[in-house]
Regions:
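Hydrophobic, aromatic-enriched interface-forming segments
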Residues: 127-180
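Interhelical loop and helix-boundary elements at the membrane-water interface
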Residues: 1-15, 64-73, 112-132, 181-197, ...
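Transmembrane alpha-helical segments that form the membrane-embedded catalytic/substrate-channel core
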Residues: 44-55, 110-115, 161-177, 227-238
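Helix-coil boundary and interhelical linker segments in multi-pass alpha-helical membrane proteins
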Residues: 23-40, 86-101, 136-158, 207-221, ...
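N-terminal topogenic module of multi-pass integral membrane proteins
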Residues: 1-91, 255
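Transmembrane helix-loop-helix
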Residues: 34-38, 72-111, 198-239
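Solvent-exposed interhelical
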Residues: 56-74, 162-205
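Core segments of transmembrane alpha-helices
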Residues: 16-22, 79-86, 130-137, 196-210, ...
Length: 268
């Protein structure tokens, strides 16, 4: 009898993109709600369904006929979605209906990403679309904790999407640098490969400054983005073909934790 191994995402960094915003959303209310635990469990279930569902969508779009893979993907997609739904239902029965449209945004971003990846595999745009959907966990958790979908909920979503977009763009920079196979890169190569990275971080920080200027978000939000922005600039200047991705992963997790700590104490 064939042993069925769980299908789980290989992009472990995506877990941080989901659960760091969730911690922020739960913490800024300064009051703990037990419903957050159910939301976290439900979110994990739907998050794990991503890989098998992506396989099914690709099979549908590409006309795949690998029956074994399709059958296994259906099984695990059903298990994960079923688990997510089990934890979701009590929240809906308790009146937390606002998480439904937020979840729909997450599902829509998944479908859009899965569709576009056929033509834009490995492109920054595809991963940025995923970030928009994954960071919906921030407003969803805030809504469950506070019972409100207000300016703070929208701000948390915007800030988290912008920040984790920074990490995505930066990782793509490192991937392009590694693909060059050059031990040392000249300034022309660094500028060519790093333009998008620098431009995105500049625009993201500028937008955060604008939000602070119009009193839409606390001033500390600027400080929260500063470390990642400086790291992105340094990473472009020091870019080479030698990249230690495991070390990079730990650094970005540290950046995410620092971002979360600063935003939690921003005083929303």
């Amino acid at each position: 009898m064939r042993r069925l191994n769980p299908i789980i995402p290989k992009e472990h960094g995506a877990l941080a993109v989901v659960f760091v915003p969730m911690v922020i959303g739960a913490s800024v209310t300064q009051s703990f709600s037990p419903w957050v635990i159910l939301l976290a469990a439900s979110t994990l279930g739907f998050f794990l369904s991503y890989v098998p569902m992506q396989t099914l969508v690709r099979g549908l779009l590409d006309g795949s006929r690998d029956a074994a893979i399709i059958r296994e993907s259906k099984l695990w997609a059903g298990i994960y979605i079923g688990a997510g739904t089990i934890f979701l239902v009590p929240m809906l029965l308790n009146g937390h209906w606002m998480i439904v449209p937020l979840g729909a945004v997450g599902a829509a971003s998944f479908m859009l990403r899965a569709s576009l990846e056929r033509w834009f595999h490995g492109r920054v745009l595809v991963d940025l679309i995923a970030v928009v959907g994954l960071t919906v966990s921030a407003p969803a958790t805030y809504v469950v904790s506070s019972g409100l979908f207000d300016q703070t909920a929208a701000t948390l979503w915007i800030l988290n999407a912008l920040f984790f977009g920074c990490t995505v763009v930066y990782v793509h920079l490192k991937i392009r640098g590694s693909a060059s196979k050059k031990r040392r890169l000249g300034w022309s190569d660094k500028i060519r490969l790093g333009t998008l990275n620098l431009l995105y971080h500049l625009l993201a920080l500028s937008f955060v400054i604008f939000l602070v200027a119009v009193h839409y978000t606390p001033r500390i939000a600027i400080i929260a983005f500063a470390p990642m922005t400086m790291h992105a600039i340094y990473g472009t200047v020091s870019l080479s073909g030698q990249v230690r991705f495991k070390r990079l992963g730990f650094i970005l997790v540290g950046q995410s934790v620092l971002f979360a700590v600063l935003l939690i104490h921003a005083g929303f």
